Amino acid sequence: AHVDPSTRTPMPRLIGAHTIDIGGIPMAARRAGNAGMTALQIFSAIPKYYNEKAGVKPERVTAFHAALAEAGIARTAVIVHAGYVLNCATPDAEKWERAATALTKELERSTTLQVRGVCFHPGAATDNDRDAGVARVATAMTRALETVDGATKLLVENSAGAGNTIGRTVQEVAGILTSLPPSLRARAGYGLDTCHLFASG
């Protein structure tokens, strides 16, 4: 169906980057503000680990919100990138359980921070069963969204397509999102990595 462009609500033009958080996430917000950014991406915990037990202390939340306000950056202009080790597409039951638990914890931390969303890499279907990999990612997302209440979204990031990684095509990303229960879909979406898009062809 044709949509008249004049009836669309313009989206805010946000410019940001993944910002280094040495000194804590409040410092990431200050660095972003000092660079003139209007958005930023951060890690809520060390990205090389699962961080299934890591939480966010109330004083850290308060300091982060104050730094965002000082920088003139809205909480809704902040994305958290999940840890790199998560593989929600894996057929290995033990590894999947750990990844799904870590994704839920990531959503919990990000909801506590009151940011817009959590962007994560779906992982790899190491058994070469791409459809099953898509289903496993959707199951992990469903668990996280059912466990954690709030407005923070889970965003599937497209992959560069190396090996058996899931999310190299629009169809795979859409397959994940449409596999979610309809009641949860408003809290899910995708993060478009243009470098990954180019690399995947």
Specify the residue positions occupied by each region the protein language model found.
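N-terminal pre-domain/capping segments
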Residues: 2-80, 86-108
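Structural preference for beta-strand elements that scaffold enzyme active sites
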Residues: 12-16, 39-41, 75-79, 115-119, ...
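Active-site beta-loop-alpha junctions enriched in small/polar residues
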Residues: 18-22, 45-47, 83-85, 123-125, ...
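Conserved long hydrophobic alpha-helices within structured protein cores
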Residues: 34-37, 171, 193
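Short, exposed beta-strand "edge-strand" segments with a Pro/Gly-rich flavor and a Y/T-containing core
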Residues: 50-56, 162-168, 200-201
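Active-site acidic/histidine proton-transfer and metal-coordination neighborhood
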Residues: 88-190
